[in-house]
């Protein structure tokens, strides 16, 4: 593991501060594709074990493409929220450069997910635990990235991420919950 990558994962403030100063879009894209591709490859290869190899690669490519679009759109949502709230010191390109590095916990958790897929049905708890751990670690790195790029404190960047997750919940999950509840009331 390169020293810069280690700094991003474990010494977040200093490592991210160095990366924001240099443009690292291609390296960030490489780490994103590697992290999300390997993690989703381990999980989906176990799920689609009976399918042909081309189908499994297509599922991995689709997962990486969808995750890339979602992550970049989420980065622009965060940039818009912070710009609306008055954090004008930020750089959207610097934030997008750091977003690929925030997926590195999935690369670290890939061996754990592989172990979970080899354990059978009880191993699914290990896979779910690895996924939850990687997502929480990714959110922490995202908070640190906002802190470094926009020169704000930890509490404000935490509040921004929490607010953005609440907005996404209201926009995408809440309508589905309401429709599901209405259907259950109509059926029952």
Regions found by a protein language model. Give the residues of each.
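Hydrophobic core of alpha-helical transmembrane segments in multi-pass integral membrane proteins
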Residues: 36-42, 168-175
């Amino acid at each position: 593991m390169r020293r810069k990558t280690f700094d991003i994962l474990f010494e977040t403030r200093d490592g991210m501060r160095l990366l924001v100063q240099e443009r690292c879009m291609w390296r960030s894209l490489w780490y994103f594709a590697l992290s999300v591709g390997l993690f989703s490859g381990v999980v989906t290869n176990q799920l689609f074990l009976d399918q042909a190899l081309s189908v499994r690669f297509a599922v991995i490519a689709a997962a990486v493409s969808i995750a890339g679009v979602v992550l970049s759109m989420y980065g622009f949502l965060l940039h818009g929220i912070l710009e609306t709230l008055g954090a004008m010191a930020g750089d959207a390109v610097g934030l997008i450069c750091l977003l690929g590095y925030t997926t590195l916990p999935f690369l670290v958790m890939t061996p754990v997910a592989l172990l979970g897929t080899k354990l059978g049905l009880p191993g699914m708890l290990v896979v779910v635990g690895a996924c939850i751990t990687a997502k929480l670690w990714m959110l922490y790195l995202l908070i640190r990235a906002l802190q470094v790029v926009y020169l704000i404190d930890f509490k404000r960047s935490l509040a921004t991420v929490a607010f953005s997750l609440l907005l996404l919940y209201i926009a995408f999950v809440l309508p589905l919950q309401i429709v599901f509840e209405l259907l259950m009331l109509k059926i029952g």
